[in-house]
Amino acid sequence: DINFKASYGGLSDNIIQNFYAPVLEESNIYKRSVAYFTGGIFCIATSAYKSFFIDNNGKFQLVTSPFFDEKISDAYKKYEDVFNQEDLTLDVLNKSLEKLENLQHGSDLIEFISILLNLNKLEIKIALVPEPGLYHEKIGIFADSYGNSISFSGSINETWSGWISNSEEFKVFN
């Protein structure tokens, strides 16, 4: 059991260390609904993602607006063009994840996202709303193999800036 505050906010709460990483490490499903998504999110808690994807056989299901960084588009192209399904294993994913330590950008990130897509560990759905609107929900649900879940809702997007450098607020629900 992990104890969490009812809400987190501001830069002083260290939301990666006190919320995101501990929950991710115990989960095998992460469902996220956001306006903005960037691949840099995978670089903020690599050891937690290792537990999630490798140890827990986790799956990340994402719904987002059509506005995401070029690395995601590049990863889709690589996903379609490069990888041979028989060559992809959790060991390949693990080695790719190890390369991400202390990185935020670059070809290692594109490769990692491509592997996630190929292994069906990352599922991205695009939410479209009538113009000039923008899909802008920000909800997250973590679940484990025992049926436990925890959710959160607030201002935070699934981006490096959202989790690391912005002053964001969200509420936690058991």
Task: Label every PLM stretch briefly.
Residues D1-N174:
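PLD/PLD-like phosphodiesterase catalytic module centered on the HKD motif
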